[in-house]
């Protein structure tokens, strides 16, 4: 087995996630449940741990209690071996202020870097759904001789306004990096696609420290990794791009190779769940060679009684479907669906109860929602807009603990 370089993982998990409201009303975006058994942060942590990067600091800020608890309960590594995944809330080490941006979060947490003294630093976001082997990107970074490496992926040009757009030469050196342009340029071989940043970076340690310090002294900076740090290093000729399509994950299928989803909106979050439910899913949760680790609750198996059924669906542990019909849906743990209820094309989070004869369609129900007997969600959008959030794509989102 090849000896790994000394790498520190920093996961940026302070995102507020306003576009995912109401799912982020009571929790940080990386703590939002996903896929029936996980939270969003589990994907980046699984990728790092599977690659044997076992010294990880998770920088948190916004409503971080459930995120901190999830990490502490479900991501315990061997302290005796010097391994750790530790949530680090804003420490206010530099005065009575919170993080003002992702770069400022690292600046205020520089003691973590000094204590670990790594050769390289992996800085990844905490709110994307994907599999990736970070070791391959680190090796690319080392061989390229760059000071910073940005993971890049092709997306439709119409969607690129939400990302940092990359232009690189044939060797992979980045010539320009524009954060969230109004009119993104297409790629040379396909004008309808753009090459964008995934928000995952590798840095040589000294390069990151110097860039973060310089940014902290710049009063005109927004102190953002994508908006300020990467453009600074691009202008210095120190940044390269790693093409995510070259990343080979053990056990990946042809369908889910290169799968990556930004789930920052209700529609994107919903669509990513629908990617899970087909017989041959676009994203396969069942890859045992690169497992996604999540909640470790000790729950009974799911149960179907009185003719209850689920088709093309994911059903979490502890759930009971009684004489009800579930289709094309993702149910988390401890969901109860009563006699005659119909759930179609929906995402149901832990502890939710759907009453006798109720109908739920094209909806996201957060934790501990109670849908009363005969009630309907996602059937009459005009009525739903008066009481819930409805996305541009017509997805009805019901907040945590609401009784209907």
Swiss-Prot record:
<keyword id="KW-0320">Glycogen biosynthesis</keyword>
<protein>
    <recommendedName>
        <fullName>Glucose-1-phosphate adenylyltransferase</fullName>
        <ecNumber>2.7.7.27</ecNumber>
    </recommendedName>
</protein>
<dbReference type="InterPro" id="IPR011831">
    <property type="entry name" value="ADP-Glc_PPase"/>
</dbReference>
<dbReference type="Pfam" id="PF24894">
    <property type="entry name" value="Hexapep_GlmU"/>
</dbReference>
<feature type="binding site">
    <location>
        <position position="164"/>
    </location>
    <ligand>
        <name>alpha-D-glucose 1-phosphate</name>
    </ligand>
</feature>
<keyword id="KW-0547">Nucleotide-binding</keyword>
<dbReference type="GO" id="GO:0008878">
    <property type="term" value="F:glucose-1-phosphate adenylyltransferase activity"/>
</dbReference>
<comment type="pathway">
    <text>Glycan biosynthesis; glycogen biosynthesis.</text>
</comment>
<dbReference type="InterPro" id="IPR023049">
    <property type="entry name" value="GlgC_bac"/>
</dbReference>
<dbReference type="InterPro" id="IPR011004">
    <property type="entry name" value="Trimer_LpxA-like_sf"/>
</dbReference>
<comment type="function">
    <text>Involved in the biosynthesis of ADP-glucose, a building block, required in the biosynthesis of maltose-1-phosphate (M1P) and in the elongation reactions to produce linear alpha-1,4-glucans. Catalyzes the reaction between ATP and alpha-D-glucose 1-phosphate (G1P) to produce pyrophosphate and ADP-Glc.</text>
</comment>
<keyword id="KW-0067">ATP-binding</keyword>
<feature type="binding site">
    <location>
        <position position="197"/>
    </location>
    <ligand>
        <name>alpha-D-glucose 1-phosphate</name>
    </ligand>
</feature>
<dbReference type="InterPro" id="IPR056818">
    <property type="entry name" value="GlmU/GlgC-like_hexapep"/>
</dbReference>
<dbReference type="InterPro" id="IPR029044">
    <property type="entry name" value="Nucleotide-diphossugar_trans"/>
</dbReference>
<feature type="binding site">
    <location>
        <position position="99"/>
    </location>
    <ligand>
        <name>alpha-D-glucose 1-phosphate</name>
    </ligand>
</feature>
<keyword id="KW-0548">Nucleotidyltransferase</keyword>
<dbReference type="InterPro" id="IPR005836">
    <property type="entry name" value="ADP_Glu_pyroP_CS"/>
</dbReference>
<dbReference type="GO" id="GO:0005978">
    <property type="term" value="P:glycogen biosynthetic process"/>
</dbReference>
<dbReference type="GO" id="GO:0005524">
    <property type="term" value="F:ATP binding"/>
</dbReference>
<dbReference type="Pfam" id="PF00483">
    <property type="entry name" value="NTP_transferase"/>
</dbReference>
<feature type="binding site">
    <location>
        <begin position="179"/>
        <end position="180"/>
    </location>
    <ligand>
        <name>alpha-D-glucose 1-phosphate</name>
    </ligand>
</feature>
<keyword id="KW-0321">Glycogen metabolism</keyword>
<comment type="similarity">
    <text>Belongs to the bacterial/plant glucose-1-phosphate adenylyltransferase family.</text>
</comment>
<dbReference type="InterPro" id="IPR005835">
    <property type="entry name" value="NTP_transferase_dom"/>
</dbReference>
<keyword id="KW-0119">Carbohydrate metabolism</keyword>
<keyword id="KW-0808">Transferase</keyword>
